[in-house]
Amino acid sequence: MSLEQVIKEIEQSQEIKKKEILENTKNILDKMEAEKKAKIDEIRALYQEKMRAESSRITASIIDKANIEARSILRNKIEEILEGYVSAAQEILRNIRNMPEYPALLNKMIEVAKKYLGQDCIIKVDSKDKAVAPSSGITYSNIDPYGGILASSRDGKVELDLRVSSIMEEVLEKIKVKIYTRLEE
């Protein structure tokens, strides 16, 4: 074998090795590029999911705050309306004694007290109602600015509060409870 052939074989061998090295390098770079792309896609998907979850959480928080604020506005408006009705009802109560139905109402309250507490029960009527209440078995005192009666059994164990202001407070409280219960549904 001549020197030229040996040199040519060496050059061919080097050329083959260069091609192998280039091919291996290209394969390694392609593999690294594919791994890089896969990692980027994985990170992107992870952050997109985190952003979706955070967006959902923020949206839910905004909706909750809006609902709370809307309910607060509604409660305030209802309270305002109720106050208007309470004022109107109190105005009517202030003048209930002047109504033609009041003597019959007062006598009905006395009948109810005697029916449930006994004929010998103690009945207190406001002094201002002396003219419209029957006089037998009735005690007169300042029990309520609007009228009504306070009654108790003879032994004092059972009391019946039929004062107009007490009844009105009770009714208003029940109305408020019903309204707020419906709001919470």
From Swiss-Prot:
Gene3D superfamilies with a match to the protein in the record: ATP synthase, E subunit, C-terminal (3.30.2320.30)
Keyword vocabulary terms for this entry: ATP synthesis, Cell membrane, Hydrogen ion transport, Ion transport, Membrane, Transport
Membrane topology: Peripheral membrane protein
Main localization of the protein described in the UniProt heading: membrane
Entry function: Component of the A-type ATP synthase that produces ATP from ADP in the presence of a proton gradient across the membrane.
HAMAP family found in the cross-reference section: ATP_synth_E_arch
Record-stated family: Belongs to the V-ATPase E subunit family.
UniProt-recorded name of the protein: A-type ATP synthase subunit E
Annotated organism of origin: Thermoplasma volcanium (strain ATCC 51530 / DSM 4299 / JCM 9571 / NBRC 15438 / GSS1)
Gene: atpE
